[in-house]
A protein has these predicted regions:
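Preference for short coil/turn "hinge" residues that link or interrupt alpha-helices
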Residues: 18, 86-87, 93, 99, ...
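Hydrophobic, proline/glycine-rich low-complexity stretches
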Residues: 1-115, 286-291
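A conserved, well-ordered hydrophobic junction motif at loop->secondary-structure transitions
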Residues: 44-71, 178-231, 235
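Catalytic-pocket segment enriched in acidic/His residues
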Residues: 194-275, 289-291
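HotDog/MaoC-like acyl-thioester-processing domains
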Residues: 2-19, 96-179, 243-250, 254-291
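Glycine-centered flexibility sites
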Residues: 36-38, 160, 189, 205, ...
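Long, contiguous hydrophobic alpha-helical segments, chiefly transmembrane helices and signal peptides
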Residues: 30, 37, 52, 65-70, ...
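A generic structural micro-feature
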Residues: 92, 128-130, 233
Length: 291
């Protein structure tokens, strides 16, 4: 079980700054890496693989395997060994997952040092274990252009039990819609009379005009930004929503959300009818919530 020098403090953990690291590489490093992952291992003159090791016009023309950028995150999990208020046995650490985004092909030789900005992306209590996520974003020195991003996930055996619940961190939000919500939302451009004309609503077999599905989605995402993202909309990366049932203006929307790493799973229900009307997920760029 994880132990702490003091009571586990999520706010202190989230505010903790991990040190930047530097990386540099050349054509030799690129070729050795390619050979290490089996390039030309079956056929030394395989043109599909030789290009990662040799080029007739010079080594500066060899190509870089996309997974080469994973080297920039080496040691990122060990940064987690020094999280304030959270200690664990590093011998029980297992590399559980690696996620990589490459924004442009890398040259065979770095023009200078690469700056790796390292941050805590997630920490989950799994009872007998914990899951730690470290994000490494790599830039060319002196440039704001992001080259690649690694998200390294470690499985920490015996490190669980630090939170009050083994479930993903959960939140609820209870905003009420106004009776004129559909009339107001239609001014954003959706003028379907189903949402404003009682006669059209009756023809569609609804007792009264219904709320736009995208309006309900807006309520839900706003709730997630408030509860999970500490009010910062720039942390939202992707949004997915499935419309399950209709909402009538004036009903209260309860949005329940569960933080799982960098993904927020959510469900929105109508309080008055206890009926699920929307479900989906939101991917965020960093851990902005409280634990």
């Amino acid at each position: 079980m994880a132990t702490s020098d003091s009571e586990f403090n999520p706010d202190l953990l989230l505010a903790h700054k991990l040190p930047e690291t530097r990386s540099t590489y050349n054509e030799r490093d690129v070729a050795i890496y390619a050979l290490g992952v089996g390039a030309c291992g079956q056929d030394a003159v395989d043109s599909d693989e030789l290009k990662f090791v040799y080029h007739e016009n010079g080594q500066e023309h060899i190509q870089v395997l996309p997974t080469f950028v994973s080297l920039f995150s080496l040691g990122s999990l060990t940064h987690g060994l020094d999280l304030p208020g959270f200690k664990y046995d590093p011998s029980l650490l297992l590399h559980g997952q690696q996620y990589i985004e490459v924004y442009r092909p890398l040259p065979s030789k770095a023009s200078g040092s690469l700056i790796n900005k390292v941050s805590l992306a997630g920490l989950q209590d799994k009872g007998k274990a914990a899951i730690l996520e470290i994000e490494t974003r790599s830039y060319e020195q002196g440039s704001d252009e992001l080259l690649c991003m690694n998200r390294t996930t470690g499985f920490l055996r015996g490190a669980g039990g630090f939170s009050n619940s083994y479930q993903p961190f959960s939140y609820k939000n209870y905003p009420s819609t106004q009776s004129l919500a559909a009339l107001l939302y239609r001014l954003s451009g959706d003028y379907n009379p189903l949402h404003s004309d009682p006669n059209v609503a009756k023809l569609a077999r609804f007792p009264r005009p219904i709320l736009h599905g995208l309006c309900t989605l807006g309520f839900a995402i706003k709730a997630i930004i408030k509860c999970i993202c500490k009010g910062d909309p720039s942390t939202v990366k992707t949004i997915s929503g499935r419309f399950l049932a209709t909402v009538f203006p004036g009903e209260t929307l309860i949005t329940e959300m569960w933080l799982q790493g960098l993904r927020v799973i959510y469900q929105t229900k109508v309080k008055e009818r206890n009926k699920a009307v929307l479900s989906g997920y939101v991917d965020i760029r960093g851990l902005s919530s409280s634990l």
